[in-house]
Amino acid sequence: MRRAVGTVLALGLVMWGSVAPGAPVVNAEPAVVDLGTLPGGSESSTVAINDDGVVVGRAKDAQGLSRPVRWDADHRIAELPLPPQARYATVFGVDASGAAFGNTGGPDGWERAVRWNPDGSTTVLDLPPGHTRTRALAVNDGGTVVGHAYTVGQSQVAVRWDASGAATALPGVEGARWTEAQAIDEGGAVAGISTVEHDLSDDLHYVRWDDGALTDLGTVPGNTHASVQGINGRYVIGTHRPVDRSGYALRWDGSERAEVPGGGTNRLAEVDAEGTAFGMVGGRPARWTAGGEVVVQALPEGYGSGQVLALNAHGATAGVAISAQRQPVRWSASGEVTALPFPSPPSPRSAIFASDVNDRGVVVGEAGGRALLWP
């Protein structure tokens, strides 16, 4: 889920390349809630949380199979039911009403985008005429979903589903055979990728749609992989990878493209309404201002790297600090960093991170195979 952010808030952070002291670390240890697992299951993980505290993610059942799940605001877990044709499903987001969104699949390549409604019922999102499969990738608070659909010949068209589940195909660049919508903002603006020949590096077009109208944001020479991580109003963030597979982070202000300085170890996860992007620059959690300045965020003592993974409407962020072991963290809008506790020491190789933060500052994540919530 992407959230529109109305203001840029000054984070008391370390300037990239400077020796200024970092923001203070919050010493008070916050509470942690273990969200639990399905009956008989042993593992769970979160993906997203809405502002009412509804959480979605996955959990293993008693047979060890991964299932999509939703926790209500009282932290009660429920398995999300599969459509009759489906054999498995994944969930990626939740809207303001508590509806969960994901994808289901079954035999013979059957695959459909799906919404799990707040009342527990399941809605398979519409299939555009002439297409055989669908996949959803992003949703906004209003329940508008974007993704793509496949034809029999395996060409791909970008799709937007409204809150009723009705599908609209979005145009690609001229002659496009593969087009995918990958991000949507709260105003309904959409961004993604469109290409004529999937194996031609110079033909990977970054695109956006406003009220369904296509804008070609151009290509990056030598690009072997293109993706969009977010859109917020006039700003789009994305990634390109050259032959060496390093990752270069990009931002568009309207149609004007800029690249994060510092080489090919950069990733962006979120962008606010003023164009400040958040993610990882040079292995450190950072924000990249609309003016082009990279500002490194403070880390807990003993940690040298990390990444911002989520942003809320008030400028608070969440993510992970990295050393020999990973540590979920939350940054306030003023730049204070808090190391988020977890119930028992997980193995060093287990997944440990904060995956989302809602507009009330509540963070969800995972440590040691357990879904966790930090109020």
Predicted segments — roles?
Residues 1-27:
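Secretory targeting and sorting signals
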Residues 4, 22-375:
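Residue-level hotspots at or immediately adjacent to binding/recognition sites across diverse folds
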